[in-house]
Design a protein with these regions (language model features):
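Glycine-rich beta-strand-to-loop/alpha-helix junction loops that act as flexible
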Residues: 60-64
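Structured mid-to-C-terminal alpha-helical surface segments
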Residues: 1-58, 68-80, 84-319
């Protein structure tokens, strides 16, 4: 029924969101991490971005891009990661872009007051990958939903951004926007693992690679393989990411070895993450590293040569 015939559209949206959770297959535990009101606010911001003059400036990356691909199989995320194209910008410039996006009409009964946008620099413009943190608020009637963005610069996207369809919540048509290719997601997360080594506290990256290795996206995007990630494209994405980031390949054997998989600091972090995310039914860290070793690890150890074949998520090996 069109909203103009609904006496209280805001109340109607809240009720319909509960039905959407069932349709997406999201569990109560997942909704504790990312409530539907938050997902609706994410959709509202991304929809405004899609309609704004800044649509070509940003590419969705991180957990939100995986949630859009894998739906209930994905990891719920509380923030949005955006890769900004072009040279690094000041926090004030980023704030100006975001305020213009917030002012874009979208028709979902959400309001993003531009005057509530707050920004701060997480990594300075002089860094290899400057990052600006953005905080804003989505208003739905009298309710308030904080939204947090991380806008990063200096990202090399290979083989190029692809068109992603965000899971549709209540609105008639899904939001379509540019997103990281899956090979790039794997390459950057794996590069960060090599760089951080035992100091790594980003357990969500291990979770993501374990999940990507075990499942093809239910709805692959245009240009993405429906039957396994191509080894050659992953190798090219890795080579570019390693070069741009200055990833120390000398540390690669340790990351892929037994000492890392059993390191007390890392396994302790994983145990806490695993308990907090019990809904995902994650295995022991050694098992996770076994999958990562077989998936991006094999490709990384062949560089600069390029492997052929594709990844089999059922057999957990390259074919």
């Amino acid at each position: 029924m069109p909203d103009r015939f609904v006496k209280n559209p805001v109340a109607s949206i809240a009720a319909r969101l509960k039905n959407e959770a069932t349709a997406l297959g999201l569990t109560p535990a997942q909704l504790q991490v990312m409530p539907l009101q938050m997902a609706y606010a994410h959709q509202g911001f991304l929809g405004r971005l899609d309609l704004s003059p800044h649509a070509e400036r940003f590419v969705l990356k991180g957990g939100a891009s995986l949630f859009a691909r894998y739906r209930d199989l994905g990891r719920p995320t509380r923030d949005l990661d955006l890769a900004a194209q072009g040279p690094p910008a000041t926090p004030e410039e980023v704030a100006g872009w975001i305020r213009e996006i917030c002012a874009q009409p979208f028709g979902d009964h959400l309001l993003f007051p531009p005057e509530e946008v707050q920004v701060r620099s997480v990594a300075p413009e002089s860094a290899a990958h400057p990052v600006v943190n953005v905080r804003l608020t989505a208003h739905l009637g009298t309710s308030r939903q904080p939204v947090e963005l991380d806008v990063s610069f200096g990202n090399v996207i290979h083989p190029g951004a692809c068109l992603l369809e965000y899971p549709r919540l209540v609105i008639p048509e899904a939001v379509r926007l540019r997103a990281y290719p899956l090979e790039q997601v794997v390459a950057e997360k794996f590069a960060a693992m090599v760089e951080l080594n035992v100091a790594n506290t980003r357990m969500k990256d291990f979770h993501d690679l374990w999940q990507i290795a075990r499942h093809d996206p239910p709805s692959p995007l245009p240009g993405e393989s429906a039957r396994g990630m191509p080894a050659r494209e992953l190798g090219e994405a890795m080579a570019r990411s390693f070069q741009v980031r200055g990833t120390p390949l000398a540390d690669l054997p340790f990351l892929l070895g037994e000492d890392f998989a059993t390191d007390p600091a890392v396994t302790g972090n994983w145990a806490r993450y695993r308990k907090k995310n019990a809904w995902a039914r994650l295995p022991d860290f050694r098992d996770v590293m076994g999958v990562i070793r077989a998936f991006p690890g094999v490709v990384a150890t062949t560089l600069p040569e390029r492997m052929t074949g594709s990844w089999d998520p059922t057999a957990l090996r390259w074919r």
